[in-house]
């Protein structure tokens, strides 16, 4: 029975053994690497770049450049005259000779590429590693990242500058249409006699449209000089551009560290009372407002903040709750908000269903 059992197992085991032996054989071509250092498609191909230029591996950059210039003049397509047995390093005389010389020079003139090439000559067994280093350098971007960053920052700064000027001019045009500011600017222009000069008739008679445009420009210029616009529509400042912010970042960082150290020493360690500037700073941080937003507030609002002592956390929480209640009352009396609530109550938002009507 043991012999019969062995006979029954024999065909199954014998059927599996060829597949087990065949699997390693299929992986052999993938693991086999060429033993030769010179590989077709890498650097100078099957030619030694040093032999192509006629220099040794210890040659300096100057010697490599000198050898390249001599061979380039000799094998340049415009000057090349084929002769029997002529060619760099014994290469056949053809138009490929000049390309081979140029490739050898490009390989050896760069220190990093030359190191990779020398490493390939010394370690021919690392076949796939040589391919990786060769194509990683060829496909790497040639442009310096620092130049790209600098150009991008300059482009953003230029866009910021013109965009801010456009917003500022729009704000001036809007203020010129507001009766309050327009009447004041017109009175100032009359006092200075600017409107009379615009209407004076000289040798070149002006049309009504030209006079109107000139008066409009006078009013806008007075508004620019008399009104200090703050916030997002303020007059553009060069120091606010991204380029100057990046350049001045170390200065701002040092000044912030010095300010923070003074704050900790004066108020946390010595326990001094806050001044008006420090109180407004704490209030602004509690309200989560930027400096430009806080500066755009009216003076009476800031005085109210100081009067209510909003730099104290408990007082600010009470003020915040009051503002939320006031906002709810305004929304409750707002006709548009009432219509929205009525619509939500009667119809509600649309629903997506898959039930066939």
Swiss-Prot record:
GO terms for biological process, alphabetical: protein folding
SMART domains: DnaJ (SM00271)
InterPro entries reported in the protein's UniProt record: DnaJ_domain, DNAJC25-like, J_dom_sf
Source species, domain of life: Eukaryota
CDD domains per UniProt: DnaJ (cd06257)
Membrane topology: Multi-pass membrane protein
Keyword match Disulfide bond: no
Intracellular or extracellular location(s): Membrane
SUPFAM superfamilies: Chaperone J-domain
Gene3D superfamilies xref list: DnaJ domain (1.10.287.110)
TM helices/strands, residue ranges: 19-39, 147-167, 241-261
Start and end residues of each J domain: 48-121
Pfam families membership: DnaJ
Entry keyword set: Chaperone, Membrane, Transmembrane, Transmembrane helix
Any Gene Ontology CC annotation: endoplasmic reticulum membrane
Similarity remark: Belongs to the DNAJC25 family.
Entry protein name: DnaJ homolog subfamily C member 25
Organism annotation: Rattus norvegicus (Rat)
Encoding gene (name): Dnajc25
